Swiss-Prot record:
Protein name per its UniProtKB record: Chaperonin GroEL
Chief site of localization: cytoplasm
GO biological process: protein refolding
Database matches in PROSITE patterns: CHAPERONINS_CPN60 (PS00296)
Organism: Buchnera aphidicola subsp. Rhopalosiphum padi
EC category: isomerase
GO CC, alphabetical: cytoplasm
Length: 548
């Protein structure tokens, strides 16, 4: 076991505080409409430029191990806030820095760290309740646009695009953020169920001008097996040919003579047919095939259920109004499945999402939910250079998370005003002793930090502006973008309640742990033992030469 370096008391806390301040100072310059950029070096390629707090925090590692522990603990605040609400990382980092700095001053002055923490916790619990009282619902398109705009660093086009996407696929619908190709941001909405599997043969294409397969009112055969023998498909092919309708086959795989027979039938016009592989792998593939069967009113032909492809009939097939297949995707539009069956299937998925342990599983389950619910919206972000593209994409993702949070818990006045108002309302709060009162004051002072930093980044005097805002009431605050005072709601400067609440709670939680830290332990740096033995052969030979 490696030897450890141990530091106690004030010595440990000073080191930890240095790390906290290095990380927080790098992150907080990005806050507000006039926040500055941070340039991040990459091991290869061009450096990236960002105004996203969590992106900056993730890049910071310090050489001194004790300082690095402080930095990593604040990084945890940013990550937790990001995971909970998708935004508010810079605010959370700033709140944590303020609480730690003020709290450690009080500890150095002889206050009891545990009582300080209790005071901070008491203030935060009251502040969260007041935030909920200040919160107003965010349901209309205008409010959603404003929240998206603020979170995307005052980019109105992004805010409008997110509001449009939410209008089209619903507040709970899946909205993806992708890299576009042009210079304009675009919104692409896919109605119906789409999955990432294209046609198995280009000979199925019946629209050569667009390079796609289009099937009108097709039957849909779903098989949870590999099909290579044409004989087991003949009965169903004959039945479909008699009906005069096209056929889509979705199976684990289709190969050999089975695929060749379908291609020949399709090119000769005997049966209008196309085949694609089933989406996903393993259990996820079975679940997605079941989703498609519910959506189209058919059955999955599965040997596990003792179903035989050779004995299947038209009643086992699903149907849809239209199917469009290109080389990469298949889209099923207007499935004829029973609404009650679809709703029942949809209601199962939220429970599975709660039980899922990995983010990847949750993401895939959310995708399934959206596809069954009837649509996926894709935001295509475009920019002139790759560096700008990455920065813009991160901002759009932040804005999307913020708008979802706003719809969930409502909004409060932005620009740091809500926390200042909350601090004013609970200013008479008292603890059980004087040390707890100091803890409460530490938390109240920290609640002014976001407003002060926004003002500082815009080049104004923080104390003057903060006092002016404190003298006002309600939503009265400072618009740093235009350098004027007024009603923040009228200015369209809104913060999601969930983002502000999460930032405050996570900051206080981690900062409280840091204030009550008394000892820090880390590995001693390993010394490079350069062996003298490596140079001995040459030295020995030289000595022998002298003797001769």
């Amino acid at each position: 076991m490696a030897a450890k370096d141990v530091k106690f008391g004030n010595e440990a806390r000073i080191k930890m505080l240095r790390g906290v301040n290095v990380l927080a100072d790098a992150v907080k310059v990005t806050l507000g409409p006039k926040g500055r950029n941070v340039v991040l070096d990459k091991s290869f390629g061009a450096p990236s430029i960002t105004k996203d707090g969590v992106s900056v925090a993730r890049e910071i590692e310090l050489e001194d191990k004790f300082e690095n522990m402080g930095a990593q603990m604040v990084k945890e605040v940013a990550s937790k806030a990001n995971d909970a609400a998708g935004d508010g990382t810079t605010t959370a980092t700033l709140l944590a820095q303020s609480i730690v700095n003020e709290g450690l001053k009080a500890v150095a002055a002889g206050m009891n760290p545990m009582d300080l923490k209790r005071g901070i916790d008491k203030a935060v619990i009251s502040a969260v309740e007041e935030l909920k009282n200040l919160s107003v619902p965010c349901s209309d398109s205008k409010a959603i646009t404003q929240v998206g705009t603020i979170s995307a660093n005052a980019d109105e086009k992004v805010g409008a695009l997110i509001a449009e996407a939410m209008e089209k696929v619903g507040n709970d619908g899946v909205i993806t953020v992708e890299e576009g190709t042009g210079l304009q941001n675009e919104l692409e909405v896919v109605k119906g169920m789409q999955f990432d599997r294209g046609y198995l043969s280009p000979y199925f294409i019946n629209k050569p001008e667009t390079g796609v397969v289009e099937l009108e009112n097709p039957y849909i055969l779903m098989a949870d097996k590999k099909i290579s023998n044409v004989r087991e498909m003949l009965p169903i092919l004959e039945s479909v040919a008699k009906s005069g309708k096209p056929l889509l086959i979705i199976s684990e795989d289709l190969e050999g003579e089975a695929l060749a027979t379908l291609v020949v039938n399709s090119t000769r016009g005997i049966v209008k047919v196309a085949a694609v592989k089933a989406p996903g792998f393993g259990d996820r593939r079975k679940a997605m095939l079941q989703d498609i069967s519910v959506l189209t009113g058919g059955s999955v032909i599965s040997e596990e259920l003792a179903m035989d492809l050779e004995k299947s009939t038209l009643e086992d097939l699903g149907q849809a109004k239209r199917v469009v297949i290109n080389k990469d995707t298949t889209t099923i539009i207007g499935g004829v499945g029973e609404k009650q069956a679809i709703q029942s299937r949809i209601s199962q998925i939220p429970q599975e999402i709660q039980e899922a342990t990995s983010d990847y599983d949750k993401e895939k389950l959310n995708e399934r939910l959206a596809k069954l619910s009837g649509g996926v919206a894709g935001l295509k972000v475009s920019a002139a250079t790759e560096v700008e593209m990455k920065e813009k994409k991160a901002r759009v993702e932040d804005a999307l998370h913020a708008t979802r949070a706003a719809v969930e818990e409502g909004v409060v006045a932005g620009g740091g005003v809500a926390l200042v108002r909350v601090a004013g309302k609970i200013s008479n709060l008292r603890g059980h002793n004087e040390d707890q009162n100091v803890g409460i004051r530490v938390a109240l002072r920290a609640m002014e930090a976001p407003l002060r930093q926004i003002v500082s980044n815009s080049g104004e005097e923080p104390s003057v502006v903060t006092n002016n805002v404190k003298d006002g009431k309600g939503n009265y605050g400072y618009n740093a973008a235009t350098d004027e005072y007024g009603d923040m709601i009228d200015f369209g400067i809104l913060d999601p309640t969930k983002v502000t609440r999460s930032a405050l709670q996570y900051a206080a939680s981690v900062a409280g742990l840091m204030i009550t830290t008394e000892c820090m332990v880390t590995d001693l740096p390993k010394e490079d033992k350069t062996s003298d033995a490596s140079s001995s052969p040459a030295g020995g030979m030289g000595g022998m030469g002298g003797m001769m």
